[in-house]
Regions:
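Generic structural signal for short, flexible, solvent-exposed coil/loop and linker residues
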Residues: 7, 23, 48-49, 88, ...
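Hydrophobic h-region of N-terminal signal peptides that target proteins for export
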Residues: 5, 10-20
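N-terminal, active-site-proximal structural segment of metallo-dependent hydrolase catalytic domains
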Residues: 2-3, 19-80
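Structured beta-strand-rich core segments of catalytic domains in phosphoester-bond hydrolases
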Residues: 41, 65-138
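Short low-complexity stretches enriched in small and charged residues
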Residues: 12, 52, 56-57, 89-94
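Residue-level marker of intrinsically disordered, low-complexity segments enriched
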Residues: 11-15, 32, 89, 125
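Ser/Thr-centric signal marking residues that sit
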Residues: 9, 31, 136
Length: 138
């Protein structure tokens, strides 16, 4: 009986560790056209921030970033998330944008803005032990 309990407990421990290690290889992405930074809907900006807080995605990709009034939209969202206890990283972009829960190790413009549309940005980060590249386009 003791041996059976010991084997069962050991098996349960291995299954638990395996399940936990499998989970660390997963990440979530939220892609969102924020329709002029949420300005087209009353309370739109706050709704954007609140949905990110609710969902807690690893990465957020935005379309229709405008940086109105010489602001940095993604930095503003990161600051609002920080006020709610979440840490996200970003870099300056125009037309589309990226947020990451994981520190960004590199970012680049793949396709620059032309006639107020059409950007593609790339960022790199590490999730667990895996280097990941995330792209956003509009």
């Amino acid at each position: 009986m003791r041996l059976t309990n010991l084997l069962f407990t050991t098996l349960l421990l291995f299954v638990s560790v395996f399940a936990r290690s499998q989970k660390s290889n997963e990440f979530t992405v939220l892609q969102w056209n924020v329709w002029q930074e949420g300005t087209m809907v009353p309370g739109g900006y706050d709704a954007i921030v609140n949905e990110i807080v609710r969902l807690k995605p690893d990465f957020v990709t935005f379309s229709e970033v405008r940086n109105y009034n010489k602001t940095n939209f993604t930095a503003r969202v990161c600051a609002s998330l920080k006020e709610k206890g979440l840490s996200y990283y970003s870099f300056y972009s125009y037309d589309s944008g990226l947020l990451s829960k994981h520190p960004i190790t590199d970012s680049s413009t793949i396709f620059p803005i032309q006639d107020d549309h059409g950007t593609i940005y790339k960022m790199k980060t590490t999730v667990g032990k895996q280097v990941c590249a995330v792209y956003t386009a509009h």
